[in-house]
Amino acid sequence: MSRRAPDFWFQPPGLRARLLAPLGALYAAATARRLARGPRTRPGVPVICIGNLNAGGTGKTPTTIMLARLLQDRGVAVHIVSRGYGGSEKGPRRVEEARHSAAEVGDEPLLMAAFAPVWVADDRLAGARAAVEAGAQAILLDDGFQDPALAHDLSLVVVDAAKGFGNGLCLPAGPLREPVDRGLARAGLLLSIGEAAAQARFAATLGTRLPLPHLTGRLAPLQTGMDWQGQRVLAFAGIGHPEKFFATLRGLGADVVRAEALEDHQPFTPQLLIRLETESRLTGAQMVTTEKDAVRLPRSFRPKVLALPVRLQLDDAAPLEERLASLGL
């Protein structure tokens, strides 16, 4: 099933959006009722939720990795809890890189397991309790902003600055899981990710009366010593916004011979891999993908593909550091 967001979500509301708006209102009402029920249980250690208001990719995974490394640098034993979207494991189960596959635990948890202990669990509360029993001093909740089962000591809402909050309507009329004003009223920090021009446009749509501190940041390629200048590449990506990955490669000087935009979490079937490898050989282009896609590749195929890692860089981390300090972290 396709998970790529339809274009009309990010355009001024037209006929299609207006026709679907009543369903969006019902979706928003259902979310509000679910959030009101609670029970908002506390697992005994600080819980930091990295969530979003939009459906789809907004940069939660690199944000979670950044927070994990920040807390580790402070000597905090931090664990990550995730639903493990796309994986078959119901959990709670600790992710083991050498043992588990993306089909079992999901691609994001498998990627994040290289940075911190990760637990996948359909029941986030059960996952948090398992993490605490294993020694977690703080929990990063990957997604779950609209899940009332677990109390959040700090909620960080992540948004793609280039996409913003789309047409401002809830699913299926727009990209939102809940109305922007309600969501931001429950959050502790807003983080927009993107380049300077996109950040300026997004800030203009927000106005000056935000109810919470606004962080900005961007995803920057990790310096690995690889010289991309003039390198012929066949790039493929199955992430929320694959065009950003292709633009990053071009910005590094790579000659992108072909850019294959896959659906988010699209399976790598044998037929797809054979086609990519054949095109790579015929064009003399090196296959390149994202870190998240690389962990989904069959182990036997991975040596044929380069991965381009990116890391989140905050413009000013002070508001985040203040919130962490208030939690004793």
Curated annotation (Swiss-Prot):
This is Tetraacyldisaccharide 4'-kinase. PANTHER family: TETRAACYLDISACCHARIDE 4'-KINASE, TETRAACYLDISACCHARIDE 4'-KINASE, MITOCHONDRIAL-RELATED. ATP binds at residues 54-61. InterPro entries: LpxK, P-loop_NTPase. The gene is lpxK. It holds the Pfam family LpxK. Belongs to the LpxK family. Its EC number is 2.7.1.130. It comes from the Bacteria. It catalyses: a lipid A disaccharide + ATP = a lipid IVA + ADP + H(+). Transmembrane segments: none annotated. Keywords: ATP-binding, Kinase, Lipid A biosynthesis, Lipid biosynthesis, Lipid metabolism, Nucleotide-binding, Transferase. Pathway: Glycolipid biosynthesis; lipid IV(A) biosynthesis; lipid IV(A) from (3R)-3-hydroxytetradecanoyl-[acyl-carrier-protein] and UDP-N-acetyl-alpha-D-glucosamine: step 6/6. It is an enzyme of class 2 (transferase). One of its GO terms (biological process) is lipopolysaccharide core region biosynthetic process. Transfers the gamma-phosphate of ATP to the 4'-position of a tetraacyldisaccharide 1-phosphate intermediate (termed DS-1-P) to form tetraacyldisaccharide 1,4'-bis-phosphate (lipid IVA). The keyword Translocase does not apply.
